[in-house]
Amino acid sequence: MDAHPDCGACAPKLHSWYDSDRFEYAGAAGGRIDRWGYPFCRGRRLSRTEEDHGQYDTPADVFWATGACLMTRSVLWRRLGGLDSRFFAHMEEIDYCWKLQLDGYKVCCVPQSVVYHLGGGTLPKTSPWKLKLNFRNGLLLLENNLARTFAAQGEPPRKALRHANRVIFWRKCLDGCSAAVYLLSGRKDFFKAVLEAHREARNLVSRPDIEALACQAKTSGVAGRYGGSIILASLLKGKRVFDYIESKMVL
């Protein structure tokens, strides 16, 4: 951090406590995000994690750094208000890292450091509440930051807001498809969790207004955004997905 004043936050590689040679779901080798706001990681595609063979041992700018072990500058933490309390337990570090980038700072993965993480300690993967938080907070993430990102890239405020609204609409449609799959497969508790997530998100949303977008500082880009769908890319490219995605990153 001392050697790189433009770095606002950094994190190590995250390995599984149970399988020490394998990346851990909550951060792996640094986080990315796709066009629709679905987060993923280098070393993690969908729910599958890779073994660490040194394939991500070069320090890299990433979109988000894991909240399991995050170092950030105290002055930036105070200025940005820390973690958004509306998120609770899921994706709040992604929201914070996105704000850091919009403030002109980088987020980095430092693979020379490795931390072993006990995943699922707060909520198990099978919890409908966990699923609800993931879907709800995914929408909050986009509402908080997407219009600001388009404004930072030079779009006029009203155009940036319309652009963000279109993306969020399609994200909601994709969530609806997931809900339908849960219902048809008999997982009614998961189906209800998605519906509840969208209902809660509507009540929690606080969008930036036109004046705030007009004041948004322009940036050279937000690192770690993939312009396509991580779900589609993973299905089509399999184990080669990260080589493909790295060539398609948008700034």
Q: Which role fits each region the language model picked out?
A:
Residues 1-39:
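Conserved donor NDP-sugar-binding/catalytic core segment of glycosyltransferases
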Residues 12, 31-62:
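Short, flexible, basic/aromatic active-site loop/helix in glycosyltransferases
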Residues 194-251:
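Membrane-interface aromatic/basic loop that binds lipid-linked glycans or pyrophosphate carriers
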Residues 45-49, 71-72, 94, 163, ...:
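Catalytic-site signature of metal-activated, phosphate-bearing donor transferases
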Residues 55-114:
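A short, conserved alpha-helix in the catalytic core of glycosyltransferases
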Residues 10-12, 37, 73, 77, ...:
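Generic structural signal for small/hydrophobic residues in well-ordered secondary structure
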Residues 50, 76-79, 147-149:
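Short helix-loop capping/hinge motifs at secondary-structure junctions, enriched
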Residues 103-210, 221-222:
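Active-site-adjacent helix/loop segment of glycosyltransferases
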